[in-house]
Amino acid sequence: MIQGKLARLGNVISADKCVDYLLNRPKLEMVGLGLIYGHPGLGKTTYAQRIAYSRGYIYLRLEAWMTAKTFAVALKKAVLQHLGMGNNPVIGSAASIYNSLIGLLAEHPEVVIVIDEIDYAFKEQKILSAIRDIVDETLAVVILVGMQNAKDRLYQINRYYFDRCGVFCEFQSPSKKDIAILAATVMEVKFGADIVDYIYKRNQGTLRDTIKLIHSLESVAKVKNLGQISVHDLEG
């Protein structure tokens, strides 16, 4: 199986459009805040990491133990490294760190920050407030990535915060077209529509299981020395 390729699946295309919309928004009228959300196993984290790497964005993953202070420290470190300003210790109160961070981002409006596992912030709402202040007081773009109920949780916690989000992108289960595109991108053996149907019926609606099935199909093809695989090759 070919490694390291990001297939242009429906979720990737939709998420790219949402990110580009935020980048090209009327900046003085709309804050740069968006949310990518969806069920586990649909490729949200893979997308977040790869778009950050490929476009030169900052990627930060929230941890369950993070407080407003530790988040401030982690984010400021990431911003300083991104801007080539060294790796010095970040000290001071949470308020002073956030103030200096907002000052940095105000001077560098091109910065884009991807924050994964935003669900952990729902129990530490000071983190959510800090993110809101960043997008309210600077032109930076912040893309939140969370689970399937993240959109509803934001609405329940703070309607004003919910309204600040300029775009919402829900990751969906892979379609047959997505499976065909992914298989064509990563499989090293040929296949037909029967294999696409086979995967679609067994992937539990997730990209993660789709990839596992593709790997198992390639293993069968390798053992049987096949250049093309069909459902009939899986029998017996």
Give the residues covered by each predicted segment.
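Central P-loop NTPase core of STAND/AAA+ ATPases
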Residues: 81-108
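Conserved P-loop NTPase "ATPase switch" module shared by AAA+ and STAND
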Residues: 4, 101-124
